[in-house]
UniProtKB/Swiss-Prot annotation:
Protein name: Putative 3-methyladenine DNA glycosylase
Annotated EC: 3.2.2.-
Origin: domain of life: Bacteria
PANTHER family with a match to the protein in the record: DNA-3-METHYLADENINE GLYCOSYLASE
Keyword annotations: DNA damage, DNA repair, Hydrolase
Organism in which the protein naturally occurs: Bacillus subtilis (strain 168)
Enzyme class name: hydrolase
Length: 196
């Protein structure tokens, strides 16, 4: 039986990254591949606020081949590679306002056998409890760069409303001056799949 697909509308993403990051918590991230469909509930995100955010790739409106998609319309997929891992971001805000939300962790839902094959020798908790881990488990690649997050094969659906959301500093941005202390990481309080 094929699952019904009901992606969130593009208007959902037309807000600042600081507003979008917590609103994505509890939503279902879905990736369809030739091997099958895998999905998980988003449990951790980080907001990157663009021109004035030293931790953002688009700080000072820096435009490169890699960051160009951050200047596009809200709802575009921004993938990049860090330490051989693909990381998944969703572009926020309006065109030419280069903001994005990094998806840091998901709670596995569909396609858990696929995730296990893609993340062999690891416990279920370790399949998706980090930004490079979840993309491997779902099958997200650089080929997804620039897609609409509202269309197959990579999209987000509504899920559940978290009982509580925690905030704190973003991870791995020690060289970003005062921006390293901004409480722009959001996670579902107490969820075991949060990265740390």
């Amino acid at each position: 039986m094929t699952r019904e697909k009901n992606p969130l509308p593009i208007t959902f993403y037309q807000k600042t990254a600081l507003e979008l990051a917590p609103s994505l918590l509890g939503c279902l991230l879905v990736k369809e591949t030739d091997e099958g469909t895998a999905s998980g509930y988003i449990v951790e995100t980080e907001a990157y606020m663009g021109a004035g955010d030293r931790a953002a790739h688009s700080f000072n409106n820096r435009r490169t081949k890699r960051t160009e998609i951050m200047f596009a319309e809200a709802g575009r997929v921004y993938t990049y590679v860090m330490h051989t891992h693909t990381l998944l971001n969703v572009v926020a805000a309006e065109e030419d306002v280069p903001q994005a939300v990094l998806i840091r962790a998901i709670e596995p839902h569909e396609g858990q056998l696929l995730m296990e094959e893609r993340r062999p020798g690891r416990s279920p908790r370790e399949w998706t409890n980090g930004p490079g881990k979840l993309t491997k488990a779902l099958g997200v690649t650089m080929n997804d760069y620039g897609r609409w997050i509202t269309e197959q094969p990579l999209y987000i659906e509504s899920g559940y409303t978290p009982e509580a959301i925690s905030t704190g500093p973003r991870i791995g941005i020690d060289n970003s001056g005062e921006a390293r202390d901004y409480p722009w990481r959001f996670w579902v309080t107490g969820n075991r799949y949060v990265s740390r």
